[in-house]
Amino acid sequence: MKKAILIVSFGTTYPDTRQKNIAAIARQVRALYPDAVVEEAVSSTIVRNAMKKREHIEAKSPTEALESMKKQGVTHVAVFPTHVIDGIENHRLKEAAKKYAGAFEQIAVADALLAKPQDYEDVAKALWESLKEEVGDFPLILMGHGTEHAADASYAMMEQSLRAYAKHEIYIATVEGSITIKDVIARMKSGPQSRQNGKVLLTPFMLVAGDHANNDMAGGMQDGEQPDADSFAGKLQAAGYRPECVIRGIGEYPAV
């Protein structure tokens, strides 16, 4: 019997956050399972190509990693996705794994971060306990990726779980999902705890703080500049709020 673990992420073109989040997870897995073959894969072709061009790193796709394991004589594979929700990327990964069912004695794909009701409660506790000192009395907005998949509903469920645990004014807005930053701003202005002209804390609800966090969320604000008008920070500023950005992926929180 030869066991292996395949860690799959969408990937990021930001080396620093890759080390703090994805590589950190891989190090933990290798430490926990020293006898297993541990490989990493990047599901995004765009990210793989960028890593090769900019950093001369040959990142494997999930299929390439599974092929490598097959050649190494691996018999049992555990696929560990780092996806937050069970959306399009996670379903593609499951389909890729199914094609290798006959190549190994056993291959199994673990759940995404948010798969069961208890997951939401656990993540809510871990996130709030990690962030509450920075948040203080101010509203907190988490930026999720969002998706056309039905799993987009996970973000609203996560917001509810966070509010229930923290008893605090917390919102989740997405870049590509149904809940936009405009929706959140409207709720903030009409809600009983509306704090127009007040500070608002912005941080990613994503594994890594990469392109979306730096551009779609902060919009250049993290470099001391005025945020881009189309960014979350820019739209909050235009609505009369004072956004403060925490550029940190949730993979940096040990409790998560």
Where are the language model's segments positioned?
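Active-site-proximal alpha-helix that buttresses catalytic centers in soluble enzyme cores
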Residues: 1-256
